[in-house]
A protein has these predicted regions:
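Long, contiguous binding/interaction regions
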Residues: 1-141
Length: 141
């Protein structure tokens, strides 16, 4: 059975939207294995929240493709997360991108696929993803 949680019925639309790069953000759930489905990762972490969180992707991209991949991510509403230290490993630069959004298994799957597609076309790889929220944010269900 599918249940829908409507944001205007539980007050989560009033939840303050977290800002990518905010140093007060704390990790809720993360993943580095592309084979683990989003629904499994969220279920194992017990994540069921209707409030916006920050979804951060850590991408490894060839330096020559960094500008093109950054532009592609920005066109999908992401920002470059400058709170993460970047480095270059095996010729691949770390590109941390983040976006504040309401996340469920479908949304997370869609965004993970979008990022995987963007970096694979550029000859890079996804290093991982993480959901972040301010430590003092109440959980809404």
């Amino acid at each position: 059975m599918v249940t829908w949680r409507l944001p205007w019925r539980n007050g989560s639309q009033n939840a303050s939207r977290p800002e990518p790069g905010d140093p007060g953000l704390r990790p809720l759930v993360s993943g580095t294995d592309e084979a683990v489905p989003s629904s499994v990762a969220l279920a194992e972490a017990g994540f069921e929240d209707d409030a916006p969180v920050v979804l951060r992707h850590l991408l490894r991209v060839p330096q020559a493709e960094l500008a093109a991949v950054s532009e592609r991510c920005i066109s999908h509403g992401y920002v470059i997360d400058e709170s993460v230290a970047t480095d270059v490993v095996d010729g691949l630069a770390l590109l941390p991108v983040a976006q504040a959004m309401v996340v469920d298994a479908v949304a997370l799957s869609r965004e993970r696929a979008r990022m995987a597609s963007a970096v694979s076309r550029a000859g890079g790889r996804v290093e991982g993803w993480v959901l972040l929220r301010a430590a003092d944010t109440p959980v809404t269900r």
